[in-house]
C-alpha cells in the first residue's frame, strides 16, 4: 500500500458529470465538483489507511481497514456503506452502497500516476491524478 501513500492532484477527468447525474446529484453541485481539481492524500498506520480529499465543495477524511464495512458521508452529501479491498500493492477497490445505487471506485497506481475508475450502473468515469 506504500504506492498510494502521499498526495495526488486531479489532472484530468472524463465523464464525471454523467456519473454524478446518475447518482442524482443536482446541477449546481455537479458543476462545483467537475470544475474543481481535488487533492487526495493517503496515509497508512499499521493496517489502517486514511484518505483525505480536499476540493472546492468539501474536505472529507475517512479512515478504514480493508475488508471492513463502515458508514461514510460523501462529499456530495450522500450517506453510504463503504468497503475498501486491497487488490494488490498498487490497486484498491471501494464499493459505496445506498438504497438508490452502488458506486464502484477502482484506484490503481502506475508510473507515478493514479487512475481512479468510477462506475455507477452502466456509466463510467475515469479520473487521472499525478503525485505531488
From Swiss-Prot:
Q: Which SUPFAM superfamilies match?
A: Lipocalins (SSF50814)
**CDD domains xrefs:** FABP (cd00742)
**Does the UniProt entry include the keyword Transport?**
yes
- For this UniProt record, give its keywords in alphabetical order, as a comma-separated list: Lipid-binding, Transport
GO terms, molecular function: lipid binding
Pfam families found in the cross-reference section: Lipocalin
Tell me its family.
Belongs to the calycin superfamily. Fatty-acid binding protein (FABP) family.
PANTHER family recorded: FATTY ACID BINDING PROTEIN
Task: Indicate what this protein is called per its UniProt record.
Answer: Fatty acid-binding protein type 3
Q: Which organism is it from?
A: Fasciola hepatica
Amino acid at each position: 500500500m506504500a504506492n498510494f501513500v502521499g498526495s495526488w492532484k486531479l489532472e484530468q477527468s472524463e465523464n464525471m458529470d454523467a456519473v454524478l447525474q446518475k447518482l442524482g446529484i443536482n446541477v449546481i453541485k455537479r458543476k462545483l465538483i467537475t470544475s474543481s481539481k481535488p487533492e487526495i492524500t493517503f496515509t497508512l498506520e499499521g493496517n489502517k489507511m486514511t484518505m483525505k480529499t480536499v476540493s472546492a465543495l468539501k474536505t472529507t477524511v475517512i479512515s478504514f481497514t480493508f475488508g471492513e464495512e463502515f458508514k461514510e458521508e460523501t462529499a456530495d452529501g450522500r450517506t453510504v456503506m463503504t468497503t475498501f479491498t486491497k487488490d494488490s500493492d498498487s490497486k484498491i477497490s471501494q464499493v459505496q452502497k445506498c438504497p438508490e445505487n452502488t458506486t464502484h471506485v477502482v484506484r490503481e497506481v502506475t508510473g507515478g500516476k493514479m487512475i481512479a475508475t468510477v462506475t455507477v450502473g452502466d456509466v463510467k468515469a475515469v479520473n487521472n491524478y499525478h503525485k505531488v
